């Protein structure tokens, strides 16, 4: 028994309210009131053995289930202080199962429409679980379309158009270098031809205003000329006395009567 509240009606009288407690009060000592003795019962396998043998050893024993199912009048006389024992095998809820129940055999044909509907929903959920994305991505997220072939970053051989460009550039560079060189040779020849005195030495004070291709003043009398220019200018005068000037055209020999 458990005292809950004390009401003060008079200073000399007290009223105690009490209700059934679900705590094992034997832990606190002997109870104040008399408690009904619980009937003894055997486990279910013992009862099954006795039934199979057909032996009735004595008066039938009252089980807890029968005692719980007694009338409320008998309950009011002797209150039950212990809680009812729950059945651990009782089905609590119907939750959809995601396992393949066809492995356990065929279902009974007495199933209702609701069960068939839930089975269809479960099958739909199972189909979505087995879906896998495609191996190759398609659409705007793909880095390149599938139809375009891959191009090698480092080609194995040199391209065919490079030699043409290189030869063209070499030809242009050679032409560009030969043109000013020939102009400079012609100018140098004309300057040396005009400025050569009778003594055969070139003038040391030659003007250097011909640009970057103008020849430098030479200290020695010999001037270096290309064979092309000498052939063009001095092709007619091959015979004659040798002079130290190779680049300039030699003077005509004087006749003996002069």
Curated annotation (Swiss-Prot):
Sections of the chain in a coiled coil: none
Compartments reported by the entry: Cytoplasm; Nucleus; Cytoplasm, Cytoskeleton, Microtubule organizing center, Centrosome
Residue stretches spanning the membrane: none
CC annotations in GO: centrosome; cytoplasm; nucleus
Motif placement: Nuclear localization signal: 81-97
Pfam hit, one: RITA
Residue ranges of the region described as Interaction with RBPJ/RBPSUH: 117-145
MF GO annotations: tubulin binding
Positions of the UniProt region annotated as Disordered: 28-86, 132-182, 195-258
Chief subcellular location: cytoplasm
Keywords, comma-separated and alphabetical: Cytoplasm, Cytoskeleton, Neurogenesis, Notch signaling pathway, Nucleus
Cross-referenced InterPro entries: RITA1
Biased composition (Polar residues): 71-81, 201-212, 236-245
Residue span of region Interaction with tubulin: 145-258
Gene Ontology biological-process annotations: negative regulation of Notch signaling pathway; neurogenesis; Notch signaling pathway; nuclear export
Purpose of the protein: Tubulin-binding protein that acts as a negative regulator of Notch signaling pathway. Shuttles between the cytoplasm and the nucleus and mediates the nuclear export of RBPJ/RBPSUH, thereby preventing the interaction between RBPJ/RBPSUH and NICD product of Notch proteins (Notch intracellular domain), leading to down-regulate Notch-mediated transcription. May play a role in neurogenesis.
Quaternary structure (record): Interacts with RBPJ/RBPSUH.
UniProt similarity note: Belongs to the RITA family.
Protein name: RBPJ-interacting and tubulin-associated protein 1
Biological source species: Rattus norvegicus (Rat)
Gene of this entry: Rita1
